[in-house]
Amino acid sequence: MNNKSFKLGLLSLFLMLSFHIQAQEGMPKGWKVGSQAYTFRLFSLEETLEKLNSIGVKYVEMYPGQKISKSGNETTDFTSITADGKAKIKALLNKDDIEAVAYGVVNASDEDLPKLFDFAKELGIGILTSESKPNQFDQIEKLCEEYQIKLALHNHPVPSYYWHPEVASRMLEGRSELMGVCADIGHWVRSGLNPVDCLKQLEGRIISLHIKDLNKFGVRDAHDLPWGTGTSNVAGVLHELHRQGFEGAFSAEYEHNWENNLPDVEESIAYFKRVAAQL
């Protein structure tokens, strides 16, 4: 390699590193972009964390029922996990330097709700993503205040209970600030709803998001595309959240190309950072 080529190579490396640093520094305050472990449901949590670490992602939302390790059958189900299982999860998170920011989508019986909050507290999880019904809200509100853990109501597509933002908005009136929503923008798109309009209706109650960019609008069986290439208006979503002063977690929930979707997740998060750096 001649001297000119060497200098050009160094310049290219410098520019790439500079862009990466600027993108990180340009992230709005309190924004944590990571992945829903369900994206990698064909793999164990151990493999999921390894995948995320390999692309520099440091936040994960766990879900109930995923195998914890490559070997063994114990899962992340809070109702059956052992002390050894929780210790294993902590060790895996520590090994890959990844923070478990949320857990869900999870519902619990009245009897199991305290166990769910205990599980989250022990693992340092600050958000429980759920579709709990309003008849549990009094108990949930007390637990949120006691544990200082947030409960985020998640929306699946129509006709699920929370498919329309008006429902969650109405049910959360007068409730603790620790209770809010996990806005799944892909399921809004499947339901024929504009994600930006939905976010406006929920301003002040948004705790976290599941981000999907879908190939079709208003179609239940639409599938994921890399962010910025589909119908979910991800850039518009980020601009609206920035306007609201939102601080919280974003989870990539990529439910397509199941066997090899890590490149799509990496491309999506790179797009997120480019948009966020310009806000």
What kind of feature is each model-predicted range?
Residues S71-T75, L113-L116, N261-L262:
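Metal-dependent catalytic neighborhoods of phosphoester/phosphodiester hydrolases
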Residues T39, P64-Q66, V106-S109, P134-Q136, ...:
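Active-site-proximal loop/turn and secondary-structure-junction residues that shape catalytic pockets
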Residues N3, A23-A37, R41-Y59, R170, ...:
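Histidine-acidic metal/acid-base catalytic patches
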Residues T48, I89, L116, I140, ...:
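Aromatic/hydrophobic pocket-lining residues that form π-stacking "cages" and hydrophobic walls in ligand
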Residues E61, A102, T129, A152, ...:
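Conserved beta-strand positions in the central sheet of alpha/beta enzyme cores
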Residues L92, D96-G180, V189-R190:
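Active-site acidic/histidine proton-transfer and metal-coordination neighborhood
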Residues M1-G26:
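Bacterial Sec-dependent N-terminal signal peptides
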Residues M62-A87:
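Glycine-rich, proline-tolerant flexible connector loops at the mouths of alpha/beta enzymes
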